[in-house]
Curated annotation (Swiss-Prot):
Pfam families: V-set. It is found in: Cell membrane. Residues 23-337 are extracellular. This is Matrix remodeling-associated protein 8. Disulfide bonds join C54-C138, C187-C273. Homodimer in cis. Does not appear to form trans-homodimers. It comes from Xenopus laevis (African clawed frog). The gene is mxra8.
Length: 435
């Protein structure tokens, strides 16, 4: 029984050493060449300000004041016996002891104390039982480098020695172990950021390069070098060093934007921002194509000379240019115009009222007499119409007498004396009206 358990452990170690890189996620770029993560085209004008943005949160440098507690490994059990559960088994920091969460697992599960020196984070489980089967997860966290890696191992328990085996299912290692035996769940990572503690501040560097138009990348000019330790190097002339600048707090914020306060035509070219974190395995490059053009000229109206008038070409048809000028009216002018309108409207109403009154009065009096003649006293029309003496007297005056000759007729007319009579024309008109 013990011999078979030892043989099983040897098989697990051999299988893990042969297949560890099949399921381990690489923590860093083994290729020292920078990876181009972005390409940006920038077009601007002469005199503008230029901002070439280059940011990365992984380049933020924080001093390790907790004695390298920025690396941690922990093992979790995700499911057991077909029932989902998330259970933390143990964890261990690079500068501390390992912590086991359940008393049941004390002295039964463990991780090598030299895991952060040799890179072996495998979990050893003694006297396995049916409650131990499930999906195990080995989690590595590097808070300084912002790295997270996970390795999963499936553990199944059997009571038959013939079913004991180890195989790869395409996603993870599957181990079928015999009950009450000792099992090793493999998890290894030998990258230097998990095994060694270098001087991180000496391995973080950022530099800016510039290529003039037509210059290849390998002949680019270096502008600025910056280190996390605070050292800074600027290249080129004093004017160029003062003109192009990066913030002094770049490593504390992860912002390495290049600022150019006043752009000229000579600033055109290709700019490259290189970010290198050798400890964390970060190598990135961002490319900027900067083009600077002159500002468009605004045409000013030409001044005409009144003394010398240009010759008029008869073949050219002159266009009449009309300029509309709008003057904003004041509030006082508005009230003045409103007063004019109201006064005119009031005068019109008065005239209309006078005409209506005169027309009605004229209709009552009639249209047969003159309005300008003074009015007489009112006379009853029935009395006038029923006065027979006047009518008789009027008829008597119309009588004709036959005379023998004309001489006697003339004498008779001359001898006739008519009594004076007052005639009221207004009364006569009313008589005629009564007839």
């Amino acid at each position: 029984m013990e011999i078979r358990c030892k043989v099983l452990v040897c098989h697990i170690i051999l299988l893990h050493s042969a297949t560890v890189y099949l399921y381990s996620v690489p923590a860093s770029q083994q290729n020292p060449e920078s990876v181009v993560v972005s390409v940006t085209n920038i077009s601007t004008h002469v005199g503008d300000q230029g901002f070439l943005t280059c940011e990365s949160y992984r380049m933020v440098w924080t001093q390790d004041n907790l004695m390298d507690r920025q690396r941690v490994v922990h093992w979790d059990l995700y499911n057991s016996q077909g029932v989902y559960r998330g259970e933390r088994l143990l964890d261990m920091f690079s500068a501390g002891e390992q912590r086991i969460y359940k008393d049941y697992n004390q002295r039964r599960i463990s991780v090598s104390e030299s895991a952060f020196q040799d890179g072996n984070f495998s979990l050893v489980i003694k006297d396995v039982s049916m409650i131990d089967q499930g999906l195990y997860s080995c989690n590595l966290h590097h808070h300084y480098c912002h790295l997270d890696e996970t390795v999963r191992v499936q553990l199944n328990i059997t009571k038959s020695e013939r079913k004991v085996k180890i195989y790869w299912d395409g996603e993870k290692i599957v181990i079928v172990a015999l009950v009450h035996s000792t099992v090793l769940l493999p998890c290894e990572n030998h990258d230097h950021m998990w095994t060694d503690r270098h001087r991180e501040e000496d391995q973080q560097v950022v530099h800016w390069d510039r290529q003039a138009p037509g210059i290849p990348h390998d002949r680019a000019d270096r502008l600025i070098d910056m280190y996390a330790s605070g050292e800074r190097r600027a290249y080129g002339s004093l004017f160029l060093r003062r003109k192009m600048n990066v913030s002094n707090s770049a490593f504390s914020q992860g912002d390495f934007t290049l600022f150019i306060p006043y752009l000229t035509r000579g600033d055109e070219g290709t700019y490259s921002c290189h970010l290198h974190h050798h400890y964390c395995g970060l190598h990135e490059r961002r490319i900027f194509y900067l083009s600077v053009s002159d500002r468009p000229k605004t045409e000013e109206p030409s001044k005409t000379n009144s003394d010398s008038a240009p010759a008029i070409d008869s073949n050219v048809v002159q266009e009449n240019k009309v300029i509309n000028v709008t003057i904003q009216e004041s509030r006082l002018h508005f009230f003045q115009q409103l007063g004019y309108i109201l006064a005119t409207l009031l005068l019109f109403i008065l005239l209309l009222t006078a005409v209506i009154l005169i027309t009605r009065k004229h209709q009552k009096r009639g249209y047969a007499y003159n309005l300008n003649k003074p009015q007489g006293k009112e006379v009853n029309m029935q009395e006038i119409c029923l006065r027979p003496p006047d009518l008789i007297q009027y008829k008597k005056e119309e009588l004709r007498i036959d005379y023998k000759n004309n001489i006697l007729k003339e004498r008779a007319e001359m001898d006739r004396v008519f009594a004076p009579k007052n005639i009221d024309l207004d009364l006569e008109l009313r008589k005629e009206y009564c007839k």
